[in-house]
UniProtKB/Swiss-Prot annotation:
Pfam families: Methyltransf_5. S-adenosyl-L-methionine binds at residues 39-41, 59, 83, 104, 111. Its EC number is 2.1.1.199. Keywords: Cytoplasm, Methyltransferase, rRNA processing, S-adenosyl-L-methionine, Transferase. This is Ribosomal RNA small subunit methyltransferase H. Specifically methylates the N4 position of cytidine in position 1402 (C1402) of 16S rRNA. One of its GO terms (cellular component) is cytoplasm.
Amino acid sequence: MAPAMGNELQHRTVLLEEAVQALVTRADGVYVDGTFGRGGHSRLVLEKLAESGRLIAFDKDPLAIATAQQIADPRFGIVHESFASLRTAIAERGVGRVSGVLLDLGISSPQIDDPERGFSFRADGPLDMRMDPTRGESAADWLARATVQELTEVIRDYGEERFAFQIAKALVARRAESDRLGPLVSTGELAQIVANVVKTREKGKDPATRTFQAIRIHINQELAELQVVLEAALSLLEQGGRLVVISFHSLEDRIVKRFMQAHASTPAVDRRLPIRAVDLPSPPLKIIGRVFASDAEVAANPRARSAVMRVAERIAP
């Protein structure tokens, strides 16, 4: 999501102008901001909308919800749920089709920069990692029960970490020492355990980066929820409506890319079958393009370096 430096009031939204320009195609439309964060995209969308326009935003984070509730605009509504609940939430609000869906994936800078949230290895804090700290299982709770196989699969698949098995074994070995050392509950200790195992260092990257990413994705079911919301967005978009997705790592971007490509392609048919091309169903999406943060934005906000924005438009009725 939108990176920042410093405290939560200094929140820089990545690809702000580019995303909103791609999203808003009609001023009287109904739009969805699936990841409100601190409201950078939402506020600019509202500036672009006519009085008859409408914006519905989602976020899991109670602090994001508190920020959203300060927006006194009758065109705006906030939903304290994951964007995976998009289909249900839209129906509950009496909306049929929407004109655009924006997803700014990952964690926000206020979440990263607050040690109490447990997302970062740069400062010691509780091992939480939940987007919504009031719901679900924390990272510490999961680490206290996960098997070597479960740990290996999560760290390997969601962190693309080559030392996943060794890290998993080290974590389970540390758990065996809980009676003497107490449970593993701090980000600092987790980062140290990983650093002791990962001997090959990537230039400019902390050895704990991949493991922290993997555990966070698992705890919040980020990739599974992304699949759900992409399907929901496709079904809810009106003809001409836009799907705009900003990703910050390859796992997310791969899912988004493949989804858009799959729904922008005519189904493959065996040429031996008596079916004409004109008889095949038209694909529902058209890919508009891919956008990266500019050099100027990256210079001002280094966390924008990894951002990739993909845009597709629904062309089917």
